[in-house]
Amino acid sequence: MAASAWLEAGLARVLFYPTLLYTVFRGRVGGPAHRDWYHRIDHTVLLGALPLRSMTRRLVLDENVRGVITMNEEYETRFLCNTSKEWKNVGVEQLRLSTVDMTGVPTLANLHRGVQFALKYQSLGQCVYVHCKAGRSRSATMVAAYLIQVHNWSPEEAIEAIAKIRSHISIRPSQLEILKEFHKEIAARAAKN
């Protein structure tokens, strides 16, 4: 790993709890500063912040979540979220696609894996909770890829659709670039068929 990547990963670890506390604060405060913990994007996908253990019952029973796409690194979910085994015990499959917080970009392969995972649950009439720490960047990138595939939208159209529902998403330029690559691959496959 290059020195800059080590620094970025280290910075993400140092800032994890302070930024998580900020996310919790924004979820609990009233008025214009309030941010909902998660939002339903369509009949299959919910986009949100860390699915805390206390939310499990609501996600499974009220939202019909049977799949969880975790864009976090393992250390981010170690103490506050269900383990893969705990998810399995309540009938939920977890797919972990580890991506560094703040500076990370999901790989093209992971975007494809995540979209196929969501489509599997879509075909079963069940829901998928896609998350990172705050539900703003890494997970929003994954949800944009899902919308690109499902609706044949451009990356910009997908991001705009998400932002209309969850206005505080933040797709960085490097994440937009990977979405453009994803879109190009999806369009090329569609042209072959």
UniProtKB/Swiss-Prot annotation:
<dbReference type="Pfam" id="PF00782">
    <property type="entry name" value="DSPc"/>
</dbReference>
<keyword id="KW-0594">Phospholipid biosynthesis</keyword>
<feature type="modified residue" description="N6-succinyllysine">
    <location>
        <position position="85"/>
    </location>
</feature>
<comment type="subunit">
    <text>Interacts with STYXL1; the interaction inhibits PTPMT1 catalytic activity.</text>
</comment>
<feature type="active site" description="Phosphocysteine intermediate">
    <location>
        <position position="132"/>
    </location>
</feature>
<comment type="pathway">
    <text>Phospholipid metabolism; phosphatidylglycerol biosynthesis; phosphatidylglycerol from CDP-diacylglycerol: step 2/2.</text>
</comment>
<protein>
    <recommendedName>
        <fullName>Phosphatidylglycerophosphatase and protein-tyrosine phosphatase 1</fullName>
        <ecNumber>3.1.3.27</ecNumber>
        <ecNumber>3.1.3.16</ecNumber>
        <ecNumber>3.1.3.48</ecNumber>
    </recommendedName>
</protein>
<dbReference type="GO" id="GO:0005743">
    <property type="term" value="C:mitochondrial inner membrane"/>
</dbReference>
<dbReference type="InterPro" id="IPR044596">
    <property type="entry name" value="PTPMT1-like"/>
</dbReference>
<keyword id="KW-0472">Membrane</keyword>
<keyword id="KW-0999">Mitochondrion inner membrane</keyword>
<keyword id="KW-0444">Lipid biosynthesis</keyword>
<dbReference type="GO" id="GO:0061179">
    <property type="term" value="P:negative regulation of insulin secretion involved in cellular response to glucose stimulus"/>
</dbReference>
<feature type="domain" description="Tyrosine-protein phosphatase">
    <location>
        <begin position="37"/>
        <end position="188"/>
    </location>
</feature>
<keyword id="KW-0443">Lipid metabolism</keyword>
<dbReference type="InterPro" id="IPR016130">
    <property type="entry name" value="Tyr_Pase_AS"/>
</dbReference>
<dbReference type="GO" id="GO:0032049">
    <property type="term" value="P:cardiolipin biosynthetic process"/>
</dbReference>
<keyword id="KW-0904">Protein phosphatase</keyword>
<dbReference type="InterPro" id="IPR029021">
    <property type="entry name" value="Prot-tyrosine_phosphatase-like"/>
</dbReference>
<keyword id="KW-0378">Hydrolase</keyword>
<dbReference type="GO" id="GO:2001242">
    <property type="term" value="P:regulation of intrinsic apoptotic signaling pathway"/>
</dbReference>
<dbReference type="InterPro" id="IPR042165">
    <property type="entry name" value="PTPMT1"/>
</dbReference>
<keyword id="KW-0496">Mitochondrion</keyword>
<dbReference type="GO" id="GO:0005739">
    <property type="term" value="C:mitochondrion"/>
</dbReference>
<keyword id="KW-0809">Transit peptide</keyword>
<dbReference type="GO" id="GO:0008962">
    <property type="term" value="F:phosphatidylglycerophosphatase activity"/>
</dbReference>
<feature type="transit peptide" description="Mitochondrion">
    <location>
        <begin position="1"/>
        <end position="31"/>
    </location>
</feature>
<keyword id="KW-1208">Phospholipid metabolism</keyword>
<comment type="similarity">
    <text>Belongs to the protein-tyrosine phosphatase family. Non-receptor class dual specificity subfamily.</text>
</comment>
<comment type="function">
    <text>Lipid phosphatase which dephosphorylates phosphatidylglycerophosphate (PGP) to phosphatidylglycerol (PG). PGP is an essential intermediate in the biosynthetic pathway of cardiolipin, a mitochondrial-specific phospholipid regulating the membrane integrity and activities of the organelle. Has also been shown to display phosphatase activity toward phosphoprotein substrates, specifically mediates dephosphorylation of mitochondrial proteins, thereby playing an essential role in ATP production.</text>
</comment>
<dbReference type="InterPro" id="IPR020422">
    <property type="entry name" value="TYR_PHOSPHATASE_DUAL_dom"/>
</dbReference>
<dbReference type="InterPro" id="IPR000340">
    <property type="entry name" value="Dual-sp_phosphatase_cat-dom"/>
</dbReference>
<dbReference type="GO" id="GO:0004722">
    <property type="term" value="F:protein serine/threonine phosphatase activity"/>
</dbReference>
<dbReference type="GO" id="GO:0004439">
    <property type="term" value="F:phosphatidylinositol-4,5-bisphosphate 5-phosphatase activity"/>
</dbReference>
<dbReference type="InterPro" id="IPR000387">
    <property type="entry name" value="Tyr_Pase_dom"/>
</dbReference>
<dbReference type="GO" id="GO:0004725">
    <property type="term" value="F:protein tyrosine phosphatase activity"/>
</dbReference>
